[in-house]
Every structure is written in structure tokens, then in C-alpha cells.
Amino acid sequence: MFRLDELVERLGGELLGDPATAVRRVATLEQAGEGDLAFLANPKYQSRLAACGASAVILAPAARDLTGLPRIVTADPYIYFARVAQLFNPPEAFVPGVHPAASVASPVPASVTIAAGASIDVDVELGEHVVIGPGCRIGRGARIGAGSRLNANVTIYHDCVLGRDCIVHAGAVIGADGFGFARERDGSWVKIPQVGRVVIGDDVEIGANTTIDRGALDDTVISGGVKLDNQIQIGHNVRIGAHTAIAGCVGIAGSTTIGARCMIGGQAGIIGHLEIVDDVVVSAGTLVTKSIRRPGVYTANLPVQGHAEWVKNFAHLRHLDALVDRIRALEERKAR
């Protein structure tokens, strides 16, 4: 539990109202009650302030006078909410040690935690305070930086590198073979050995069941601060710039480079051998088929509509070339 003046002392902001007001958790405007700290990050929800039962709220300067509740005024209420949530929900503390049911073939620091069923191969390097969850598999020669945490059943293949303070969620696979095959004249396939690595920077979070393939010759590189959601597929030799965030079910084909601070919406697809510059936003469901060389927001999908309307519009779309030819002919006739 924190008093409002304690929060402001730690995190900044302007405090209006009783500084001794105590809060024990953060909550939404609709669900907040006694002892809760709510936040208003989107102005379209400001009408909900009137019925809010929170003990205090976090507001932007433009909304400071919309309520008489004790409040913290800050330039970015959503960031402030995130910082407060971190205070109320610190990371789980783990007891160092190696479970008797773990298999460890490399020397590890005394500060690490290795759970039951985990397997650590030879020549593995674990930094201080690393946590290896149950059922994880760490391949020969892999490197994991200090403070990183692997949840259950994560697999890191041989020679891959994970930086400091990373979080990898359950079922993620880092360093499996990339999809590399050469086609014979008879249509059969010859497997190309994937001899690169996956190299991941510091402070990266990787969602559940996300897969990152090792490079064919060069490395697959995920830069520091990148945030990956669940069930993302990243092909071999992909490079992702610092602090880029990618939502769930995105597929990125091999040898594509994505810049820093990009945001990729859920279920987007990016074909191989493209370049996307820094500060690009790709909308959900968009298929990227060519390089993006200017920052901005890019969308290539249709908004939802009723089925009957969609069928009618799609029928017109199938005849688009003919319609264009008819319009062009009419324009030429009019010009004469």
C-alpha cells in the first residue's frame, strides 16, 4: 500500500487533494473501488469519471478539473499507470538453487534458479540471477545474460545468445532451423544446414509459443528492448531494430530487416528480403509485400462489414479491370 505523496515522491507528477490518501492497487475507472487508484488515459472515457468509485485517479493536465477526487496530474497517465503497477506488482522472487530433477552439464553461478525437468547442456553460460523454468532445454554453447527469466518449457538451441534482463514466456523456441531448402530439377528438396545463430539483446520480452529461427549463414538478430507477443514466427536472418513491438500471430519471412521503434499489428505478414525503416507502424492484418522506406502508418486490409455487403462489393472488385476500361472509354469519348 502506498500514500499518494509517496507515489509522487517516487514517480513525479502534481498531487491534488489529500496527500495521505492510501491506495493498494490500480484499477479501471469502471471497476475501481475504495483503496484503488484509477487512471484516465483516453479522453473519450472521461464521462466515466463522474461515477468512478476509486480513492484517487491519475489524469492528464487537460482533465485535472473534471473530478474532485484526490488525483495525480501527469503528462502521460498511461505511462504513470504502468510505473505504479510495477510498484504494486514487483517481479516474483525466486530461491536460488538447482532442483534435484534438473540435468545440468555446465557450471552455473550460485545465484541462478533451475527448476525441475530443466536440461542445461555442456558449455552453457548463465549470468547471475538467471531463472530457468521447469522443462526448459538450453543447448550446447548457449549464453544467457544476467537477470533473464525463462518460463516453463522454453527451448534455446545451441550457440544462441540471450541478453540481460530478458523474459521468455512458456513454449517459446529460439534457434530452430530456418526454412532453408534448395530445389532439385525433379522437384525434390535438399536441406541447407542452418549454421547461424539467434542473437537477442538486453531487455527483450518474448511471448508464449513464439518461434525465432536461427540464421542460415549469418545470425538472426533481435535488438535490445524489442517486445514480441505470443505465437509470432520470425524467419532466418531477420533483423529487428531496438524497441520495436510486434503483436501476436505475425509472420516475418527470412532475411527481412525491420528498423527501430516500429509497431507491427496482430496477424500482419511480412514477406522475405524486405527492408522497413525506423518508426513504421503496420496495421493489424496487413500483408507487406515491398520495402517501406519512409516512416509512417501503413495499412493493407478491408474493414469489417456485413456478409451480404461484402459479397456484393467483392463481386464488383472481380470486375474492376472491366469497369476501369469502361470509364476510360467514356472519358475518351467525352474528350472528343
Swiss-Prot record:
Keyword flag Zinc: no
One biological process term in Gene Ontology: lipid A biosynthetic process
InterPro entries, sorted: Hexapep (IPR001451), Hexapep_transf_CS (IPR018357), LpxD (IPR007691), Trimer_LpxA-like_sf (IPR011004), UDP_GlcNAc_AcTrfase_non-rep (IPR020573)
One MF annotation (Gene Ontology) recorded for this entry: N-acyltransferase activity
Reactions that this protein is recorded to catalyse: a UDP-3-O-[(3R)-3-hydroxyacyl]-alpha-D-glucosamine + a (3R)-hydroxyacyl-[ACP] = a UDP-2-N,3-O-bis[(3R)-3-hydroxyacyl]-alpha-D-glucosamine + holo-[ACP] + H(+)
GO cellular component, one term: membrane
Pathway: Bacterial outer membrane biogenesis; LPS lipid A biosynthesis
Keywords carried by this UniProt record: Acyltransferase, Lipid A biosynthesis, Lipid biosynthesis, Lipid metabolism, Repeat, Transferase
UniProt xrefs under Gene3D superfamilies: Hexapeptide repeat proteins (2.160.10.10), MurE/MurF, N-terminal domain (3.40.1390.10)
Active site (UniProt): 236 (proton acceptor)
Subunit comment: Homotrimer.
Protein name: UDP-3-O-acylglucosamine N-acyltransferase
Species for this entry: Aromatoleum aromaticum (strain DSM 19018 / LMG 30748 / EbN1)
